[in-house]
UniProtKB/Swiss-Prot annotation:
This is Serine transporter SdaC. Keywords: Amino-acid transport, Cell inner membrane, Cell membrane, Membrane, Symport, Transmembrane, Transmembrane helix, Transport. Belongs to the amino acid/polyamine transporter 2 family. SdaC/TdcC subfamily. Serine transport is strongly inhibited by KCN, an inhibitor of the respiratory chain, or by CCCP. GO terms for biological process: amino acid transport; L-serine transport. The lineage of its organism: Bacteria, Pseudomonadati, Pseudomonadota, Gammaproteobacteria, Enterobacterales. It comes from Escherichia coli (strain K12). Residues 1-22, 68-99, 162-163, 223-249, 319-347, 391-406 are cytoplasmic. Residues 44-46, 121-140, 185-201, 271-297, 369, 428-429 are periplasmic. InterPro entries: Amino_acid_transport_2, Hydroxy_aa_transpt. Disruption phenotype: Disruption of the gene leads to phage C1 adsorption defect. Mutation does not impair vitamin B12 utilization. Inactivation also leads to increased ampicillin resistance. Mutant is resistant to phage C6. Mutation also confers resistance to ColV. Deletion mutant lyses upon glucose depletion in the absence of exogenous serine.
């Protein structure tokens, strides 16, 4: 009896200890969330003045952590280990709702994958012609080489995808922090002049309006919902009934890392420029690094910008691929199940990979202008799945009821509604 108790305690201790795989997933979560959008964040978040920026910095961690923890708990609440988000929604909400949410989930994430395929082609093409002084190959060939390169990592499976992302995080964070430190001597007091509660700098809007419209910017800057389901499934297989505690710990560390590194970079950029500079950068629709390179006449920043963007896009593409694959697989499995058929998962993964390769290549070659609009329409769906669905499940699903009664649930719902309303306002204004 004593031996059994000792071995149980020992196994619990070994499961509660931090593992190498936990670090890998922590960096994988960071890698999915912090993409090339971080290069526009200082402009989009800073143009409204210092007060909204400070408030957003305070809200960033709780907003990101509580929402993603809710979605992770939702995936973990499925009856059977190995059930991803597409299976759990069907289990909790029925076959019809399961199919609809799976469809929405796919169409919210898949366009982001298409945007990344266009973005990496544009960035490499620009880097070759401007920085390297080379004539880039035809767009169709260049995009094919780049997408095949990223899809090669996908062929080695989920573990390899997360490993590749975690490796790419190191140079990305390193360069981001070096840039933030490099800008410190350029800090000036101009941004501090916008420390006013009644106006909000260059936007022409009041404080509350600026803050309201800035919330979605923060939500999507730290959003890594496409990888959450794969993360929860992997950790449940590894840790069993301790998965929820372990996932919460990994999420907390990933989010602390995200908020500290990104907000330090944002504040450093904002403090080194004037509000008029930020407004000019927004008007020109260029990344903060491109603007800084011209503003401080620093060619080294001009060189670094595309390199950082390429690393950022690659790791975010891989993270979003996991979510898009899950959605696509879910639609196929549910469709076949309705006809009484099934498909072997490795065969389905190969079909999905081929579909993703061909469609991302076609879109990257054609570079259609409607793509940005489609991606924007996916915004409210992501916000609903991330913020509202898990909170609804806490009220309605017995397996989730143990998480009810916390003030953080109210906070997540309020932030979700603010984000969704602001997205719709921006779309139709």
């Amino acid at each position: 009896m004593e031996t059994t108790q000792t071995s149980t305690i020992a196994s619990k201790d070994s499961r509660s200890a931090w593992r190498k795989t936990d670090t890998m997933w922590m960096l994988g979560l960071y890698g999915t969330a912090i993409g090339a959008g971080v290069l526009f964040l200082p402009i989009n978040a800073g143009v409204g003045g210092m007060i909204p920026l400070i408030i957003m910095a305070i809200l960033a961690f709780p907003m990101t952590f509580f929402a993603h923890r809710g979605l992770t708990r939702f995936v973990l609440s499925g009856k059977n280990p190995g059930e991803d988000i597409t299976e759990v929604v069907e289990e909790h909400f029925g076959i019809g709702a399961g199919k609809l949410i799976t469809l929405l989930y796919f169409f919210a994430i898949y366009p982001i994958l298409l945007v990344y395929s266009v973005a990496i082609t544009n960035t490499v093409e620009s880097f070759m012609s401007h920085q390297l002084g080379m004539t880039p190959p035809p767009r169709a060939i260049l995009s094919l080489i780049l997408i095949v390169g990223m899809m090669t990592i996908v062929r080695f499976g989920e573990q390899m995808i997360v490993k590749a992302m975690s490796i790419l995080v190191f140079p990305f964070v390193g360069v981001l922090m070096l840039l933030a430190l490099y800008l410190i001597p350029q800090w000036n007091g101009a941004a501090l002049e916008t420390l006013s509660l009644d106006t909000a700098s260059a936007t022409g809007n009041g404080l509350w309006m600026t803050l309201w419209l800035a919330i979605p910017v923060m939500v999507f800057s730290f959003n890594h919902s496409p990888i959450i389901s794969s993360f929860a499934v992997a950790k449940r297989e590894e840790y069993g009934d301790m998965a929820e505690q372990k996932c919460s710990k990994i999420l907390a560390f990933a989010h602390i890392m995200m908020v500290l590194t990104v907000m330090f970079f944002v504040f450093s950029c904002v403090l080194s420029l004037t509000p008029a500079d930020l407004a000019a950068a927004k008007e020109q629709n260029i990344s903060i690094l491109s603007y800084l390179a011209n503003h401080f006449n620093a060619p080294v920043i001009a060189w670094m910008a595309p390199i950082i963007a390429i690393i950022a896009i690659t790791k975010s593409f891989l993270g979003h691929y996991l979510g898009a694959r899950e959605g696509f697989n879910g639609m196929v499995i549910k469709s076949l199940r309705g006809k009484g058929k099934s498909i072997e998962i490795n065969k389905l993964n190969r079909i999905t990979a081929l579909f993703m390769l061909v469609t991302t290549w076609i879109v990257a070659t054609l570079n259609p202008s409607i793509l940005g609009m489609i991606e924007t329409l996916g915004g409210p769906i992501i916000a609903m799945i991330l913020f509202l669905m898990p909170m609804y499940a806490i009220q309605k699903v017995p397996a989730m009821r143990k998480y009810s009664g916390h003030i953080s649930n109210v906070f997540v719902v309020v932030m979700g509604l603010i984000a969704i309303s602001a997205i719709f306002y921006s779309l139709f204004s």
